[in-house]
């Protein structure tokens, strides 16, 4: 299965979905649900910057995909009352690409760079003086006649977003004054998001129906909104448009999303560890070959949620399924030496 085919992938599935996301996106911090600590901090920092009529300190947002990093970047610009320029690390291939963006910023504007960990080293070098001194060093000419010219930039705020904070270089990370990690959302928070999105979409949904969708959404707002749209389609055809717990359950089972939010790929990964490798430990390369997936897909897409929920763990010797995973699938715990710690965990 291709990652972009997964209903519960935290990545956007299409440009159309990105348009739908924008329609559901909160515009102000007061409308933003979840991430209370980050929201409270930003509220104070933004208000202080506005009172001083200064640019907000540079902001780094990191965490798994689909948790609202882009939404927060838009909210920062909206709350500051300034413009927003948006791009991504892979798009900025040459120093000139970044220079064109920076020289067109208005005072206190927000520049949002998604996937900032994928900036090329040569572009990153240009960014350092821009962040620290609001200056741009550019080379004019070539060879012996080349010379460096400094251009003054207006004060601005860089909002960087990344799913791989560990891949940022130390010099770049050190230039951010505000660094925040986004966490997975609780079922209660996701239920509020479902109710809000359903109202915007004109969907008729009960609180228990919203909770049923929320608890299968892997702690991710992007996933919960996607599941809501699919359940709405099911309800319009099968239940006269009314979404309750039974309708949501039937729709999600039809979509192959089980009671804890696992899909075919999740179940395949866990069952491979348990049935083919005796519960582990198994190296990630062997596991990738066994399920015909790329190593990066396992590490970046499949594992984070499974580990966070306690169904799998990383050890120095490889990946292991936990007793919780065995219980979920109704399988007996292995009694071999390799998985002895599963028995310790069970006890």
UniProtKB/Swiss-Prot annotation:
Residues that hold DNA according to the record: 295, 314, 319
Residues engaged in binding Mg(2+): 70
GO biological process: DNA recombination; DNA repair
Alphabetical UniProt keywords: ATP-binding, Cytoplasm, DNA damage, DNA recombination, DNA repair, DNA-binding, Hydrolase, Nucleotide-binding
InterPro entries in UniProt: AAA+_ATPase, AAA_lid_4, DNA_helicase_Holl-junc_RuvB, P-loop_NTPase, RuvB-like_N, RuvB_C, WH-like_DNA-bd_sf, WH_DNA-bd_sf
One Gene Ontology MF term: four-way junction DNA binding
UniProt subcellular location: Cytoplasm
Gene Ontology CC terms, in alphabetical order: cytoplasm; Holliday junction resolvase complex
Family affiliation: Belongs to the RuvB family.
Functional summary from the UniProt entry: The RuvA-RuvB-RuvC complex processes Holliday junction (HJ) DNA during genetic recombination and DNA repair, while the RuvA-RuvB complex plays an important role in the rescue of blocked DNA replication forks via replication fork reversal (RFR). RuvA specifically binds to HJ cruciform DNA, conferring on it an open structure. The RuvB hexamer acts as an ATP-dependent pump, pulling dsDNA into and through the RuvAB complex. RuvB forms 2 homohexamers on either side of HJ DNA bound by 1 or 2 RuvA tetramers; 4 subunits per hexamer contact DNA at a time.
Official protein name in the record: Holliday junction branch migration complex subunit RuvB
Species of provenance: Nitrosospira multiformis (strain ATCC 25196 / NCIMB 11849 / C 71)
Gene that produces this protein: ruvB
């Amino acid at each position: 299965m291709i990652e972009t085919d997964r209903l519960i992938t935290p990545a956007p599935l299409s440009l159309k979905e990105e348009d739908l996301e924008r329609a559901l996106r909160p515009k102000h911090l007061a409308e933003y649900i979840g991430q209370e600590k980050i929201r409270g901090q930003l509220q104070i920092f933004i208000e202080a910057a506005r009172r001083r009529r200064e640019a907000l300190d540079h902001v780094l947002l990191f965490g798994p995909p689909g948790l609202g990093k882009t939404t927060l970047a838009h909210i920062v610009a909206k709350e500051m009352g300034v413009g927003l320029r948006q791009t991504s690390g892979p798009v900025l291939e040459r120093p000139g690409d970044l220079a064109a963006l920076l020289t067109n910023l208005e005072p206190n504007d927000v520049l949002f760079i998604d996937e900032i960990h994928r900036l090329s080293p040569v572009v990153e070098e240009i960014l350092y003086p821009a962040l620290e001194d609001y200056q741009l060093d550019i080379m004019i000419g070539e060879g012996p006649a080349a010379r460096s010219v400094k251009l003054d930039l207006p004060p601005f705020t860089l909002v960087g977003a990344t799913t791989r904070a560990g891949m940022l270089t130390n010099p770049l990370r050190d230039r951010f004054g505000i660094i925040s990690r986004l966490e997975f959302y609780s079922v209660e928070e996701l239920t509020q998001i479902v109710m809000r999105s359903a109202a915007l979409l004109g969907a008729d949904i009960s609180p228990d129906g919203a909770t049923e969708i929320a608890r299968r959404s892997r702690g991710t707002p992007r996933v919960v909104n996607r599941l809501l749209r699919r359940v709405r389609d099911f309800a319009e055809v099968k239940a006269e448009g009314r979404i309750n717990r039974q309708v949501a359950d039937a729709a999600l089972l039809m979509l192959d999303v089980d009671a804890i939010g696992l899909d075919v790929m999740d179940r395949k990964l866990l069952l491979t560890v348990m049935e083919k490798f005796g519960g582990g430990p198994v190296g990630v390369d062997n596991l990738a070959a066994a399920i015909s997936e790329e190593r990066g897909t396992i590490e970046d897409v499949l594992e984070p949620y499974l580990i966070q929920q306690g169904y799998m763990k990383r050890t120095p010797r490889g990946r292991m399924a936990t007793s919780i995973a065995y219980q979920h699938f109704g399988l007996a715990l292995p009694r071999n030496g390799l998985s002895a710690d599963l028995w310790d965990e069970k006890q």
